[in-house]
Amino acid sequence: MQDLVRPRGAQVAAFGSGGDTDAVFSDADAAALYDVMNPWNPAGWPADAFYDDLVMAADSVLDVGCGTGSMLRHAREQGHRGRLVGLDPDRAALDRARRRTDIEWVEALASDARWRAEFNLATMVSHAFQCLVTDDELRTSLSAIRAALREGARFVFETRHPQARAWESWSPSHTSDIVDSAGRALRVWHEVESVVNGVVTFTGTTAGSDGGVLHVSRSHLRFLDVETLDAFLAEAGFEIEARYGDWDRRPIDETSREIITIARRT
């Protein structure tokens, strides 16, 4: 999955951001565009392959912030026979996910999850974890995820390392041109509004070939350093099983762009 800025663009707004949409470009169009721009592709993207291996080895998987459900849909297509559950508050994204009826799709926030010891793997892929912006959102979401896991089960996710300052490339000078599923030529770009106390606020704009703006969303992502992240995990009842700075599983160092975490429920 390419993950141009915030992967799963359709569900960014669902985690607390708003957006304006032209009448000819609906929320459903935004969800479909996300799938066109970010297909789940383990053969082409190391991040997708990393998660694919974990999901295929687990008999019960909860994907928190599943968006259009591309990871779980791919797992089922590849022969996963266990329980697969996708959780997301974005209705348009879930409507697209629900085309696959042999997976459970739940419309809710992470903090609203009420499962008890039902899964042996929980995931938040494509930097979805960064949509948990406030301390309260982090605490309540981590608590709910831990409760959903069996004892000793894993919670696996990644967050961008703040030292890499990824947001500095989120600007109108970095655009993506693409043809959507309806055959429309579109241009997509992002622009940072502010960076305050580790929270980056930015807009995402989709325009037509004539330059007319079709959709604008405003989003917030939190960048946690390792020490702060680990404090939240320990408080919630997780211990770190493995930690990587890139998808080739190299340790975190001063060049790392990611904080990839495999945490275990204690």
Give the ranges of each region predicted by the language model:
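Conserved class I S-adenosyl-L-methionine
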Residues: 2-67
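Class I SAM-dependent methyltransferase SAM/SAH-binding core
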Residues: 69-112
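A short acidic, Gly/Pro-enriched loop at the edge of an enzyme's catalytic core
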Residues: 111-121
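A short SAM/SAH-binding and catalytic strip from SAM-dependent methyltransferases
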Residues: 120-136
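A short glycine-rich, Lys/Arg-flanked "PGG" loop and its adjoining helix->strand segment in the class I
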Residues: 139-151
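SAM-dependent methyltransferase
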Residues: 156-230
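C-terminal lobe and adjacent flexible extensions of AdoMet/dcAdoMet transferase-like proteins
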Residues: 224-266
